[in-house]
Amino acid sequence: MATIEQAAPRDASLRHKRVINDMSIQVATVNGSGSQTANSVLLRAIFQMGIPVSGKNIFPSNIAGLPTWYTIRANHNGYIARKKEIDFLVAMNAETAREDVMNLQAAAGVVYDEPLNLKSLRSDLTFYPVPFDKLVAPVCPDARLRRLVRNMIYVGVLAHLLDVDLAEAEKALNKQLGSKPKALALNWNAIRAGVDYAQQNFQKFERFGVARMNKTAGKILIDGNSAAAIGCMFAGVTVLAWYPITPSSSLAEAVIDYMHQYRVDPQTGKATYAIVQAEDELAALGIAIGAGWAGARAMTNTSGPGISLMAEFTGLAYYVEVPVVIIDVQRTGPSTGLPTRTMQGDILSTVYLSHGDTMHILLLPSSVEECYTMSMEAFDLAEEFQTPVFLMSDLDLGMNNWMADPLEYPDKPIARGKVLSAADLERIGKFERYRDVDGDGIPYRTLPGTEHPLAPYFTRGSGHNEKAGYSEKPEDYKNNMDRLRRKYETARTRVPAPVVESDPNAEIGIIAFGSSHWAILEARDQLRQEQNIPTAYLRIRALPFNDDLRDFVKRMKRVYVVEQNRDGQMCELVRLAVWRDCNKVRSVRHYTGFPIDARTITDEILTQELSG
């Protein structure tokens, strides 16, 4: 067992040394008050200074009036997972201000709306009262707009206190509002008012600040839903059937915008796509399956409640072998749960979705780049294996902005799998829709409209034989189910392999997937630097697993599966896959609805190590 030491106390002489480019800022406002634009400007300004950043929006499941928090993390080491400790608070919401202040760690800074009178709450914080209403009045004559514009004042105040480059703030604002000259001028004047007030009344914040670096050159800021939508377009999607649901709606909206731009016949001006907002998620999947059967590249997107409704049609697509892509941007459950909080809670329900024996292909992106590349790959896999393929994102990855390298133009053609043309049918002289010709479990198919007498077949969700004829014979049913299992085994060699980061000295292994990846990177450094515990790491990128997983677990003394759900769903799947070594596998679970953080992972692993 690894030796665990108590972390040494920080040198008191360093307690007031200004920390540069390593801080977390939380803005507490009211939903619908216009703070999103101000927060985006602040995030982008720091990003444009060359400092690695991430933004996390914790918002309520209503349109306006309830508390919302936006956290910006800047870190010179490139750590972009959520950090629990807040170093600077902007308190704009009277309902939560006192609790927000009491939750801060010592020596934090607080900018607050002056009437809230927070200064007396704690003596170990630095307070900066700002008269927002007084400052916004001369900047914005229209009283109806003041509640929106006033948020830009705290951008200016923070620019002074933390040394955010004002020129970069101006560029960021221009990127946000450049197409609206009046709004641009109005908001810039509000930022200037905040800067001027802060310069006249406050010293720089002595504990934290930012300074220009060169670690974001060439990178972009983008959310996972937008990246996935771009991937779907490059994959050739022409049919989107969907039903609105948080947090996946923005993905569909992005696909629709791109279709309007790029799926129009240049000669006629007519649309070459179909978008259907269905009456519910079940209907949406039914439409997508019909389109996939007809030969279109079709998709739907949803979240956990929609996945529950889609079970019956998913089983149909699996059994009759129709390609379709389903993007699940996961949120908390069960039932309505917390619609605007994140979780990785749909893994077990999705991999086995439907009644009877079904096992589905799941792709598990951990970055916006993989949201892009895996959404493309999902369509290829769906057609190659003639089956539903699920892309499993989550709210944190899908709706928050992340740093990323520019998305690369695809370098390989679309792969449609085993599709027979009329010429193929004429040459082979025989076609049996569900026959395993090649031994890989994947049959050949034809598309409606193929002009050959052998091409048509009847697609049925009831029992069928190799010729697609109705059959209740036990041998036909068993033969079909065995072939479907062979097809799934073949998929092990085709889905994205896990990424393994080895350490020759490691006895402890960590397994994770999806957006948890970023907290894992930081937690591994914490374990090594604070406790001298080296770790190896395997990041699962798809189901079904390949042999890399078994080999990884076999090499380790103990393996911790880290995930964001209560029941350790991925851990159970890992234990099934490595049943000979399942006693090595332990579970680290996080399920508050907030994105997972490194310290939670580190502390839980250390606790389990101490307990044996």
Residue map of PLM features:
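A short helix->loop->beta-strand "cap" motif at the edges of active sites that frequently abuts
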Residues: 104-110, 124-125, 273, 322, ...
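Thiamine diphosphate
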Residues: 19-101, 239, 246-352, 361-382, ...
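Short gly/pro/ser/thr-enriched loop/turn and capping motifs at secondary-structure boundaries
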Residues: 60-63, 117-120, 135, 248-249, ...
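Flexible, low-complexity linker and terminal segments
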Residues: 221-235, 374, 379-612
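Active-site cofactor/cluster-binding pocket
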Residues: 2-235, 239-241
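Flexible, glycine/charged-enriched surface loops at secondary-structure junctions
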Residues: 10, 56, 168-169, 181-189, ...
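Metallocofactor- and cofactor-centric catalytic cores in central/energy metabolism, strongly enriched
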Residues: 14, 71-75, 88, 92-93, ...
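A glycine-rich phosphate-binding loop feature that marks nucleotide/adenosyl-phosphate handling sites
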Residues: 59, 211-214, 247-250, 279, ...
